[in-house]
Amino acid sequence: MCSIADLDGIGPFSSNPQCGHLSFTLLFEEAVLAAVPLGLCVVLALLRVRQLRLQSPKARRDRLYYAKLTALFLLASVQLVQLIQWTRPSTPKTRASIAIAAVSFASTIVFIGLCHLEHIRSAKPSDLLTLYFVTCIAFDIIRTRTLWIVSGGTAVASTFTVGLVLRLLFALLESRPKTRALQRQYLRESPEARTSLINRLFFWWVNPLLWTGFKRILDPGHLFNLDRHISSSHLFHVSAQRLNDTDLSKSYAVLLLCLREYKWTFLAGVLPRLALTGFTFAQPFLVTRFLSYESNRDARDAGATGTWLIVAYAGVYIGIAISQAGYIHQTFRFITMVRGSLLTLLYHDTMNKGSSAGIDPTSAELTLVSADIEKIQMGLQTMHQAWASFVDICLATWLLERHLGLATIPSVGFSLLCVVFGGGVAVMAGSRQTLWLEAIQKRLGLTSDVINMFKSVKMTALVNISAARVLELRDKEITVSKKFRRCLVFMVSLTYLSNVFAPIIGFTTYTLAPAIHKNNILDSARAFSSLTIFALLTEGVGSFVHSAVNLMLAVSSFERYRTTLLEKHTWHESKKASRRWTLTAPPLLENTDAEQWALEVLAATADAHTPPDDKQVCIQARDTNIGWSSEKIVVQSLSLVVRKREITLVTGPTNSGKSTLLRAMLGEAWIEGPALHRHFDRAAYCDQIPWLANKTIRQNILGGSPVDEDWYETTLQACQLKPDLGRLAQGDQTVVGNEGSRLSGGQRTRVALARAVYSRLDIMLLDDITSGLDPNTTKSIVEALFGKDGLFRRAGQTVVVASNNASFLSLADQVVDLGSGSPKVTRRNVESSSPVTAHVHNQTSPKGSRIDSARGSLDEISVADFRLEEPKREPRRLDSDTSIYMYYVRTVGVVNTAVFLALCMALVFAMVFPSIWVAWWVEANARGETNQLAKYLLVYFFLGVAALIALIGGGSHLMLRMVPRSARILHRALLDAVVVAPVPFMTRNDAGETLNRFSQDLEIIDTDVPLSGFTTLFAFITCIAQAIVVCVSSPFVTAGMVPTLVLVYFIQKFYLRTSPQLRALDLEAKAPLIGHMQETLRGLATIRAFGWAEDYEERNMRLVDESQKPFYQLTCIQRWLGLVLDLVVAGIAILLAIVIVSDKNGGATSGFLGIALTSLVSFGLNLGGFIGGWTGLETALTAVARVKRFSADTAKEDLPEECQTPPTDWPQRGEIVFDDVTASYGPGTTDVLSNVSFRISPGEKIGIIGRTGSGKSSLVSTLSRTLDLISGSILIDSIPLSSLPRDTVRQALINMPQDAFVLHGSIRTNVDPRSRLTDEAITEVLTELGLWPILAPLGGLDADAVSALPAQGLKQLLCFARVLAQPGRVMVLDEATSRLDPEASAKVKQAIMRRSEGRTLLTVAHKIDELDGYDRIMVVDAGKVVAFDTPGAVQGYLSSSSPTSSPTCSSSAAALSSGAHRVAAVGVLGTEAGRA
């Protein structure tokens, strides 16, 4: 027992041995361990009470509430009893005992009030009470032990023990979540937001997710909800407000914005990171103290010292585990916030960006949401390391100076030199990464176009050429990336250069400079304490270099975001026309000058009209220039007034600016000079290229409008969609596909038109809505919408329609002609048709046309009949880890892998063996063998050189040889899978999902897999080597390692059942983001015109949230694993400490004990590296697995029997035979062609006509093998197409599909993609089509095709140039002139007739008068050939037939059979009789 007098000092330790060695005094425990935490907690509790009183109730009183209050009331009662006991004179006490007891009692009363408010007004248990009571329990255990050894203190000790039990009970109750008591809206919060501090510190809240992933396949529904603070809506509204006040012209503006906005989350990681530094730098003191303890085992206080050393080891290593997990978790929470902000801000700014004319706007945004965001995530992971490394270096320098004196200067100077070089590498790496990202951007731009225009690319046989161009861009990207990878190799070399040579320099200086060591030999305590500090010093240097490079990479990506946002803001601010999405209405003309000007314009353009007042004016322009920039003015000096409830027709030749004018009316074009004023906020807009979302037909038509079934039916009828829907298996629930690829061109146009009609907006802006429609369908739509009793007239809507179709002339109130140099406006009653009709063509159908508009239609393009399918999820446990590893090893090369592994093992040996060499050195010094100093120093130095050689060799081999090889092979595997995929397969798959494989998956494979692989392999081998060294120090530690390894095995087995699934979900959730961004960019003008911007932003936020869930929760389970493995290291450290203290005989020499203790420090650091690398590698390999599955599972369009090789000059003649052909787009779908039989003689010119959706395009699709046959056969020059590879067929034909596909590159590349023609031949065909005068000033054949020809009609002409310049015997044109004005169309027809001499020509058209000069005309209806004869015979047939009749194939044959040409089944078509 101990007297109270011995414990009434401030201590901290008692001087009486009877109280126990190294025992705290009771006064110290009361004044420091009790009073300090209590005082802080009371102050914070009062502030927290004030805060909670302002909160709304979130939970009800339940049994947990009453249990907690009961525990606190009992605790207060016990404290009151204890206070009374302390006041008794006979009770032994210190001078502070009564005061502490009184304050404790009073504080418990405060805690009762706080507990009540925390339960009722907070969704989670009280962090403050939990932290205080846990801390209090730890200190009270020490106080309880002290009270029980005080003489005469049994009563107060018993009472205090009861209080300790009650504190423990309350801490357990307070740590329980109050799920059952929470109100319903708070139950949707993330478990992290509803759980206790202890639960969050040890990541117990992720255990349910880990168990779910262990037992079953995860899907998005199994993931936790995000808490409110990291939800995208919250992040956007917070950051958007700050962005408005940010000057984006300043460097680093976006980065600083994120730091300011989320500073508290950033700072939340500072305290645990500082704690980690404290715990980490406690290790050298523990090593020194342990070695001292080992040398003085016989001391009187050795037992107590050993016990405290065990406690200290436990505290330090458990503290390292918790603090490291805490700061990294806060880092990733900050990254999640930054990620959510950037994705939502970019989309919001994209929604407000300027439209582009011809320049593809997609690639920059796609790179920003994929590659750049990944670089930012990776860079910010080391943000706390950047500043903490300086603290670590300073502390390490101070500690080294205590051990090595002035010898510290050269070693630390060398380390700082590495830091300086590291900063330079970081700057260089940032600029080189920018070049790499720009190369990725170019590749993704072309890849996106190929995927979205897949059918056109296939039909034109440009898929291999496009793929070769993509491969070329990939090779350039890899070449550019090598410069960046050299920086990475240099960075890693600098990191390990300090690690290897700093100890060598320090020990060499110390031993060779007598003035420094002063005859003090390098003993084990000094050597291994110094080695421990060197490990921490070099870790700080390596962390700084690594974090500096990563941060610079992140900064460069932040700057790309800033530049993109700045460009959009600059464009927005420079516009003169008001924008639709502004909150206020655009300004009207208010002054009398404006009114007078409007009167003048109206007087100049109308006869005897009363000028309207401002309320009747919809659009006003005066001497306005319109274009896409100040250098690209398209419409000059436009003066126009569009009045409400009128129809305005805009006409003009191709490239005259019709589409640009409509864009200007939406505020989407560049305005120069006086403004173009719009007196409306929203308009129904139909783009020239119909934009459709990848949704159902019904969803596209409804858009954001409320559901009105009657009006919906009226809209379908007016737009002639009812017959089409009747032929689709899913009707209006048919998904339209990427870019509407599951619909025909005419159907896409009519769905877009129906969307405009259904919206019932006052303003209709319609661009070329009759292209791709047959005459009868056009006539029906024009009458139903524009006629005297049409929907537009009845509703009093204002309509501006851009078209050259003569159907609108008699219905328009005014006509704007853009084809006469300067715009000319003509009112309806002015019969001045000459300036107009030059650009207008008649599309009325022949009288008595047999092509019935009311008949059921067939879908012409792709898989329109396919039922709505759920996206097929990739299996997440299909491939074993071994198979994926082996697949990746094969891509990088088995020999390359073996070389790299050997270099890694050499590196580990050269870095681990020096500690053993130092042990032998100090033991030799201890024996007095000081004459071999040169040997030890030289070997030490050469080991460092060997390590450096192995490091540089291994890093260069990995980054400059292995990674580029795998990058090429895996990209080629993806691209090859796409190239050989059938068209229906690609149209079924979402374009965003496919593109995500070329962006996100390859980004991970190029960056994460090699870096994580190197870190994992090196750390793993190092951990094994260091574990062996630790085990050598004691056989007991070896015995303890066995169950530890078994435990680690089961931990990783449990963890790896979930983490790859989460990574797969993470990758899958990014695909909709990319797809949504693509969809938005392509339909930007339409979305803004309809006023759907807010809806699309909300959808983007939902997609961001769905993407954030797996991303954030993956980082959480990674922290769980890191914490568990760090606790395993803590267990090893505690076991080692116990073994050393318990081994009375000193089982290991001081040298090997020093190695064990030093290796334990390095083992913890390397295990941390192994954890980070391994978790990164096993999740990054998910991307490799996705590539492997996609390349293996993607269907191939060529069948085994399609393997014959035709003659090199096939087809020689161009004879085409269809023999009883029936075709459909898949099993269970409607036949799109039924029993079609005909023969086309060599050199014939055949026109194919029929209403929209009749099967014309399906018929020519069978020729290009993009549509499979159910039965029958097709022969060209007597060779069945089913026996040939499909691309061989396409290359032999000359195809011109409906949708023009322009290759990225020069005009020369587009016209002559296979490099067969001379420049003169290319120029000739361009001149023939009227393109050369446009292209010559822009660079001629070297001009960029996309930017030089912005108008869709010009792109179509360029594709015609490609078609006409190609050699070949069979030419197939599918409605190719549908978007051309009559003048351009006439030029094209003339060129076709000239250049098709001697060729077989098939031309799909909507009306027979477009086919003058053709030998025969084929009429297709409902998938059947109903007529096939000379133009005169077909014209007579159509004129004599009733439009309401429903002819069959046989009846048509009977009517048209004459001589050599028959429509009925031909029989054996290869025989002479069949050809007679």
Curated annotation (Swiss-Prot):
All residue ranges annotated as the ABC transporter domain in the record: 619-845, 1216-1447
Membrane topology, record value: Multi-pass membrane protein
Residues involved in ATP binding: 652-659, 1250-1257
Glycosylation sites: 244, 464, 694, 776, 805, 842, 1235
Induction annotation: Expression is positively regulated by the cluster-specific transcription factor frbF.
Predominant location category: membrane
Biotechnology: FR901469 inhibits the activity of 1,3-beta-glucan synthase from Candida albicans and Aspergillus fumigatus. With minimal inhibitory concentrations (MICs) against Candida albicans and Aspergillus fumigatus of 0.63 ug/ml and 0.16 ug/ml, repectively, FR901469 displays greater inhibitory activity than other 1,3-beta-glucan synthase inhibitors such as, WF11899A, echinocandin B, aculeacin A, and papulacandin B.
Listed PANTHER family: ABC TRANSPORTER ATNG, ATP-BINDING CASSETTE SUB-FAMILY C
Similarity section: Belongs to the ABC transporter superfamily. ABCC family. Conjugate transporter (TC 3.A.1.208) subfamily.
Protein name (database record): ABC-type transporter frbG
Organism: Dothideomycetidae sp. (strain 11243) (Fungal sp. (strain No.11243))
